Amino acid sequence: MSRKLSHVLLIGVGLFSSTWVMAAVKEYDLTIAEQTVNITGKPLKRITVNGKFVAPLLEFEEGDDAVIRVHNKLKNQDSSIHWHGLILPGIMDGVPGFNQFDGIAPNKTYEYKFKVRQNGTYWYHSHSKGQEQDGLYGPLVIYPKNKVPLTAGEKADRDYVVLLSDFHNSTSGQIMSNLKKEADYYQNRRETVFDVFRQIKRDGLKATWKDRSMWNQMRMLKTDMSDVTNYTFLMNGKTPEQNWTGNFKAGEKVRLRFINASAMSLFDVRIPNLKMTVVSADGQPVKPVPVDEFRIGTAETYDVIVEPKQANYQIEAESIDRSGFSIGTLHDENTSPVKSIVMPTPRPRALLTMEDMGMNHDMSSMKGMDHDMSSMKGMDHDMSSMKGMDHDMSSMKGMDHDMSSMKGMDHDMSSMKGMDHDMSSMKGMDHDMSSMKGMDHDMSSMKGMDHDMSSMKGMDHDMSSMKGMDHDMSSMKGMDHDMSSMKGMDHDMSSKTMSSSGSDEVVYGWANASTPAGLKALQYSDLQSLTPQKDTRAPEREIEIRLGGNMERYIWTINGKKFNETEPFKVKYGERIRLKFVNDSMMAHPMHLHGMFMQLENGQDPSNMPNKHTVIVPPGKTVTTLLTADELGEWAIHCHLLYHMSAGMMNKLIVANVDSNSTDSKDVVAQPNTNDKGVNQHAHH
């Protein structure tokens, strides 16, 4: 054998050995089944994975070849698993109806195979019906090769996943059915007449009436921060009473990988008396940001480093509707056993404002919304028929209400029996109503006032007759979605509280987390990519994604259409585009893109913009991202609030290899290749 040939063979063997060493095969078997679980003291049938609720942690290293066999043992239900935030071939993404993937039939097995091309904190969940809510979700962590930290600042002695989720005693199917019957079905913390009086005292009667008239005409609730309530919030599958605990020793650094795996809940996260340093967002490394708290949207992830010094710290994740907490403990294992948790006092709940609707209180700008109440058939607006509502105005001491001058108000107040609201305590409220001429105070439209309407004879509550009340606000011209202060959503969490604490107190504005003075809450504008972005091109074009809905029928839309009515977004492979999310609704939407990372336009230089797979779009606001379409396939883009997606807020983004009009599968669907050495530039650092 010649020396030259021997040299070539040695090189070949060396390359093969190197490839073999670097590309370890990591295999898992996951069995999906229905079993009885007991989370809240009531045995319930829920979905388990490998007999566990919640599903087990999956761990990989960057460069591994993942082989995951999923066995569906559910009766009469197809299933699926989506690998949330992972860059992989489209057919491995796990969304039925996309990329020629049909789901996993009962008693069948599907083998997911893909190259692990990134590192970071991610998770996995079903993309079939409401199975995610019912238990099919779990954490997924990818370590850098050989678990070497990316920076010295990320080096930690302990590493814990903190999986936040919401558990309901009703199944996902029951919840969706209830929302379809009545969108406000779970709104059990509506405002009362006393909230109205508090607003009058603060803003004055005229401003209060104007504000509430607009909300009533839209038939929306200021309290609608979350569509579904009555959740028990879990941390790593444990209730607050069960108290998940992570141990440490004095002097150690601890990495906490927060994952919001809830179906419908956003959380404000804090560890009182312990500073956190954010080092990763959505699995992607960012420059360190010291914070005291952060808001985490559904499907987002944040990694933080902490250096605990006390014996115990309580991890608190409070739902933004202030209905409960997910709680756990950090405990110094060399000290006495941790005591039972202390339930924190809820922070004041936030009420939505007209600014959250992007309207600046000018109803004339709401073109496209038909507020002609004459279409509300069956509603007798003669207030004399509203028996059971006793508003004795004579008891409102100190309030100079000359009712005779209130033209346009035909309300026989004497007949409103049964509402025992003693106004005698409202002294000092001098509201001259003579200036309120011409105001049509149709009190029958005061939705959101928690009064039993069963006694209000003559009112037909069949809302199907309310023609023209389509809450898809994409047609509401004149709505000023001011982006100047947003740049990708700046969560102004400064405290504007009416009181220091207490669940009955309120603050105003979706973004108001009641952060105590002097403490730092993470803003989207704080996030910078740890390493410079490789693609800083300006976008070639913009795709507008308007988020709206019709609350009377509980329908959620993108650009005015439900998923089954939409045309896919089509993008050329390699194209640089801007995605413009415009929220025309009164609720926040965490918008998630499969298959690729977006760069959030948050005021940072293009080279420093952070990568995100999910962005919160607050009510009435606009958020923009940049995207390099460098992954072939059909990719879901949707709201990650489960019931919003199920009700229609979803579309398909097709990245094609040829012209943008092609949908030929051979040009779109990238087949799996476990030897793929390509690296997505937005996922690898």
Question: Where do the language-model regions lie?
Answer:
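Bacterial N-terminal signal peptides that target proteins for export
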Residues: 1-9
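N-terminal signal peptide c-region/cleavage motif recognized by signal peptidases
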Residues: 18-19
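Histidine-centered copper-binding motifs that mark active-site loops
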Residues: 23-270, 274-296, 335-372, 382, ...
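Extended terminal and domain-junction accessory segments
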Residues: 27-29, 138-198, 289-576, 630-634, ...
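Extended intrinsically disordered, low-complexity coil regions enriched in Ser, Thr, Gly, Ala
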Residues: 92, 266-287, 321-332, 588-611, ...
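A cross-kingdom feature marking solvent-exposed beta-strand/loop segments within repeated
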Residues: 95-100, 277-307, 562-565, 603-624
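Surface-exposed interaction/gating patches
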Residues: 238-267, 271, 533, 537-551, ...
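C-terminal soluble interaction/assembly domains
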Residues: 571, 577, 582-591, 596-657, ...
